[in-house]
UniProtKB/Swiss-Prot annotation:
GO terms for cellular component: nucleus. Residues 677-697 have a biased composition (Acidic residues). SUPFAM superfamilies: Zn2/Cys6 DNA-binding domain. Pfam families: Zn_clus. InterPro entries: prtT, Zn2-C6_fun-type_DNA-bd_sf, Zn2Cys6_DnaBD. This is Regulatory protein LEU3. The lineage of its organism: Eukaryota, Fungi, Dikarya, Ascomycota, Saccharomycotina. The 9aaTAD motif is a transactivation domain present in a large number of yeast and animal transcription factors. The gene is LEU3.
Length: 886
């Protein structure tokens, strides 16, 4: 028994010892639990921090990064996914209230697929998100949103596919051209050297121009899928390829001559597509590249060519209206309006269908924008395809168009509603609704515009799209001008419209004046926004589409007209003057060449301001002489009522021409066709002397307390002879097309295009099969055994460059854009201003044709040393088998 008890006691004590050891070991294991540091967790690598504590782990010490132990740390991609889910949940709760049950179910299915798709949170995209967050914090202090007091936030509410023309980071709230993300990769920029006619571009030149287009121009109209790359775009559509290069050359230093020559060639290609196209419904990069192929990509070329048309000096020569009409009809011809459902195009793949739908939406956007800017009825078709793409951002059956393009389509549709509502009376001469209906309709449209603005602001409205929204607001409120009676009810001084009206002659005096104050404030806010974009990025104005510059000019005319009217005392004149001066600076800096439309508009705006100021002073003097009874309204009506939302702009130009006596001037110029060049030069010198005297007089009268901004305002708005100044500007149109004399060509000769420098008609098959200049040089060296008389004949028939040897430029090695810039740099360093950098030289083109007009032949006939005379002599000698060099 004792032994048994001893055994029991021994076993109990042993069990107690084993339990205590187990507890001790458990506590030791609990204390020695391994924790990986944050960096090793993120990289999913083995960590020895528990062994080296308190020293950093081996990997952190090697990378020289802090070794942090955090118990509740989770990897970044999970946190990014959870944040995206949370943001999408908040957006759904805010937006689902306006959708039907079917749309809600469809939207939920789409969102589930997006959230549960692990490919949306790969390491590459996480790195991009990190980089974007870092760049956002860097540029936040100088972003334009901070000027408006709005926070900057990154939005992940958009789906981004590889085929989207905008990259992942392009959906940020701010438009930041300095840190633009529309950058093409090196693989996308790879392209073989290409040539069109006598224009040759190397691979580096093509890459540079495509990058220029992607970073500077693509943001205004994201219609082209640049992810295809330059080489593939060329095989799909050579026309689109060369249009992109032409647009990229607009601001390249030292490439003005190259841009001019390429513009002529591109113009001929587009005209060939318009007249005799080859239709391809499903183009492929495996097809042979042909210039005159009409497809979805040629429509994109016309859209880009419409937004950035060739440079002209007047609105009448602008090609935007013609090219957008061609683009719309061509889009219908290739079936873009029914690409999503028609059995005829069922063979097209999904990528091509998405391309077609996006292009069709852009056609309607650009067509409405051009029509609203010129005051013409728009040819648009906001059909089911366009409307469904606007309303349902993530529909499976539709293309995932960029958010920027969707917002542009919404604004364009509202502009179309304005025209259809306010100009929908066939019984009226102008199509305008009656006076009783006008005021209520304007109130309804204004409320609809406010709702649209709120909706767009919630969906990350950037600066470019807000620019278009403010333009639409100005277009809507401009209809208040048409409430005023016509000019027959006011005073007139001969052919000069004074625009004076009685208060009793106003249909709805109070509402009309209230609306005019609204349109004044809207125009001021629009110009303030445009100037803020310029201050945020001084280079953005250089890449503005031509329509944007025209919108700035039109809003400035509204401000000038209302400041110099009887509503002067009711307006914020100081802000209006500042906005007007900013508009002059904006248009001047938007100029590409001297005497283009932007350059001339800045000068015309100065004349319009001084003209209205003189008229306003004369009206005030008349009121004072009448005893101080201000019984009349002044400058509140318009004469031009056929241009819809831009009636005021064309009415201002009409008043300017009336004041300048342009009608009389045109009659005088028809009678007298010859002029003395010496007298014209003397007049120019006298005018320059008057300008210098005027500036000296203004500077001598400057008060001591006037700052530079006020001094610039005074110089801009004080013109001594506005009528004379405006007449000179209106006469100067060197960039407009030259008239083609109908009797100057024979049936067998080739016509040159207006303002052309190319004499021969383009052979499209020859262009595609044309050898490069280096190959032509080698080929010419191999053919050196040709007889002398044949060489002489070819030399005679070939146009000779002015001021150079008879060697043709095609036989010389090509110069890259960088080399041309280096050659141009010494000549232009002395003259850095716009006026001196791009002088307009009214000389003969680079190449002269054999078929000249009679006037040009007679102009140099008395000069016996001219090439014209001896060239004809050489032709006669060759005809009679005489060698002129023997």
């Amino acid at each position: 028994m004792e032994g048994r008890s001893d055994f029991v006691a021994t076993s109990q004590s042993g069990s107690e010892m084993s339990h205590s050891e187990t507890r001790n070991r458990t506590g030791m294991n609990a204390r020695k639990r391994k924790f990986a540091c944050v960096e090793c967790r993120q990289q999913k690598s083995k960590c020895d921090a528990h062994e080296r504590a308190p020293e950093p782990c081996t990997k952190c010490a090697k990378k020289n990064v802090p070794c942090i132990l955090k118990r509740d740390f989770r990897r970044t991609y999970k946190r990014a996914r959870n944040e995206a889910i949370e943001k999408r949940f908040k957006e759904l709760t805010r937006t689902l209230t306006n959708l039907t049950s079917d749309e809600i179910l469809k939207k939920i299915e789409e969102e589930q697929e997006i959230v549960l798709d692990n490919s949306n949170f790969t390491k590459e995209k996480v790195k991009q998100l990190r980089k974007s967050a870092f760049e956002t914090t860097e540029i936040e202090p100088r972003s334009y949103k901070t000027l408006r007091g709005e926070p900057i936030s990154y939005s992940t509410n958009r789906r981004h596919t590889d085929s989207s023309p905008l990259t992942l980071l392009s959906s940020s709230t701010n438009f930041d051209p300095v840190h633009s993300t529309n950058v093409m990769t090196d693989d996308q920029l790879k392209c073989l050297p290409k040539s069109l006619g006598d224009v040759y571009l190397s691979s580096s030149d093509i890459a540079e121009l495509f990058q220029e287009f992607a970073t500077k121009y693509h943001q205004f109209l994201p219609v082209v899928d640049l992810s295809k790359g330059a080489e593939r775009i060329y095989h799909l559509s050579p026309c689109l390829f060369w249009v992109i290069l032409l647009i990229g050359l607009r601001r390249k230093f030292g490439a003005t001559d190259l841009m001019t020559r390429l513009s002529v060639l591109v113009k001929s290609v587009l005209s060939e597509i318009t007249i005799s196209p080859i239709i391809r419904y499903t183009p492929s990069d495996k097809d042979e590249p042909v210039l005159n192929v009409a497809s979805v990509y040629s429509v994109q070329a016309f859209l880009l060519y419409t937004f950035w048309p060739p440079l002209t000096s007047s609105l009448s020569a602008d090609t935007s209206w013609n090219t957008i009409g061609t683009a719309m009809f061509q889009a219908l011809r290739v079936g873009l309006n029914c690409a999503g459902f028609s059995k005829e195009y069922a063979s097209a793949n999904s990528e091509l269908v998405n391309e077609q739908i996006r292009t069709w939406i852009c056609c309607n956007v650009v067509s409405q924008t051009v029509a609203s800017s010129f005051g013409f009825p728009a040819y648009v078709s906001f059909d089911y395809l366009v409307i469904s793409s606007i309303r349902v951002p993530n529909s499976k059956s539709q293309v995932d168009i960029p958010n920027e393009l969707r917002q542009m389509a919404q604004i364009a549709r509202f502009e179309n509603q304005i025209v259809n509502t306010m100009n929908s009376t066939p019984a009226s001469v102008t199509g305008m609704v009656s006076q009783e209906e006008k005021q209520p309709l304007l109130h309804v449209l204004n409320q609809q515009l406010s709702q649209l603005e709120i909706s767009l602001e919630e969906n990350n409205l950037d600066d470019i799209r807000k620019f278009l929204l403010l333009v639409a607001k100005v277009h809507l409120l401009t209809y208040y001008f048409t409430d005023v009676t016509s000019q027959s009810a006011g005073k007139s001084n001969g052919n000069i419209y004074e625009g004076s009206y009685s208060i009793m002659e106003l249909d709805t005096s109070f509402e009309t004046k209230r609306g005019l104050v609204k349109v004044y404030n809207a125009a001021v806010n629009f110009l303030i926004h445009a100037n803020s974009m310029w201050e945020h990025d001084p280079t953005i104005i250089k890449y503005f589409p031509g329509l944007f510059v025209l919108n700035i000019w039109q809003s400035a005319c509204i401000i000038s007209k209302l400041i110099h009217s009887s509503l002067h005392s009711m307006l914020d004149v100081n802000s209006g003057k500042k906005a007007y001066n900013n508009a002059i600076s904006l248009t001047f800096n938007a100029s590409v060449l001297k005497y283009d439309m932007a350059y001339r508009s800045s000068g015309i705006m100065r004349s319009i301001w001084s003209l209205f100021a003189n008229m306003y002073d004369a009206w005030k003097n008349d009121q004072k002489e009448g005893g101080g009874r201000l019984n009349n309204d002044f400058n509140l009506g318009i004469t031009i009522k056929s241009r819809m939302s831009v009636n005021v702009f064309f009415d201002c130009l009409y008043i300017l021409k009336e004041k300048c006596g342009m009608a009389k001037l045109e009659r005088e110029t028809k009678v007298s066709t010859a002029y003395n060049v010496d007298e014209e030069e003397e007049e120019d010198e006298d005018e320059e002397g008057e300008e210098e005297e005027e500036e000296e007089e203004l500077s001598s009268k400057v008060p001591e307390n006037m700052d530079s901004q006020q001094l610039r305002t005074r110089k801009f708005t004080n013109v001594r002879h506005p009528e004379k100044k405006a007449r000179k500007i209106i006469e100067t149109i060197p960039l407009d097309p030259n008239p083609i004399n109908a009797g100057s060509t024979s049936s067998g000769s080739s016509l040159t295009t207006p303002n052309s420098q190319v004499a021969n008609t383009i052979s499209y098959r020859g262009i595609l099969n044309k050898m490069s200049p280096r190959e032509q040089l080698n080929h010419a060296n191999l053919d050196s055994s040709v007889s002398t008389d044949i060489k002489d004949t070819e030399a005679v028939n070939e146009p000779l460059p002015i001021g150079r040897n008879a060697e043709h430029p095609a036989n010389q090695p090509p110069l890259s854009i960088t080399q041309m810039q280096e050659n141009t740099l010494p000549a232009t360093q002395a003259n850095s201003s716009l006026l001196e950098t791009y002088p307009i030289v009214q000389s003969n083109p680079v190449t002269t044709t054999i078929k000249e007009s009679p006037n040009s032949i007679m102009a140099g006939w008395d000069n016996w040393e001219s090439d014209m005379v001896w060239r004809d002599v050489d032709i006669l000698m060759n005809e009679f088998a005489f060698n002129p060099k023997v």
